[in-house]
A protein has these predicted regions:
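Short alpha-helical segment that forms part of, or immediately flanks, the ligand-binding pocket
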Residues: 48, 67-75, 89-90
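Nucleotide-activated donor-binding/catalytic signature segment of Leloir-type glycosyltransferases, i.e.
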Residues: 22-42
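Short hydrophobic beta-strand element within catalytic cores of glycosyltransferases
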Residues: 79-82
Length: 164
């Protein structure tokens, strides 16, 4: 899957991993390295600056259950695109992000990501819609809201308890 409007894209990659060198080589061979900033590991203050300038947070991992970066992105109003599995399924909804079904083959997964990115580039107004939805959804993950929810749940359970 190719991304068609490449001139509209810039990719910021924060962090390092086992595939970094392979990905950098791929970017050079496919003449897209000029569209990528390879940040590596960043101090938190610098990583926050990258988040604040982003239009989309993309997680391509299929091994992480529910990374905290989703909530960090939400706190900055940045929607997340992720594979639809584990905790991502419960955290990301159509209002605050894009869930991509996991396919049987790697190539199908890559193609699905490219298709979703192309849809966004064809309809850039969707970035704003997702950002607004992300701000709404983020409210439910604030500690104060979680505390309120858990307290009401406990009170509900305790009120139903029989005392002998």
């Amino acid at each position: 899957g190719d991304v068609y409007k490449r001139q509209l894209l810039h990719l910021d990659i924060v962090g390092d991993g086992m595939l970094k060198e392979k990905l950098q080589q791929y970017a050079i061979e496919h003449d897209i390295n000029n569209m990528i900033t390879w940040h590596g590991q960043l101090p938190r203050v610098e990583a926050v600056k990258v988040f604040n300038s982003a239009h989309l947070h993309v997680i391509t991992s299929v091994s992480e259950g529910n990374p905290t970066t989703i909530w960090e992105a939400m706190s900055y109003g940045v929607p997340t695109m992720s594979f639809d599995h584990c905790g991502m399924h419960d955290t990301i909804c159509d209002r605050c992000g894009i869930r991509i079904p996991i396919a049987k083959h790697y190539e199908e997964c890559v193609s699905a990501v490219a298709i979703e990115i192309n849809k966004l580039l064809e309809h850039p107004e969707r970035f704003q819609q997702l950002a607004e939805g992300t701000i709404e959804c983020a409210y439910h993950y604030k500690w104060s809201e979680r505390e309120r929810f858990l307290n009401s749940l406990y009170e509900s359970l305790l009120s139903k308890k029989k005392v002998y």
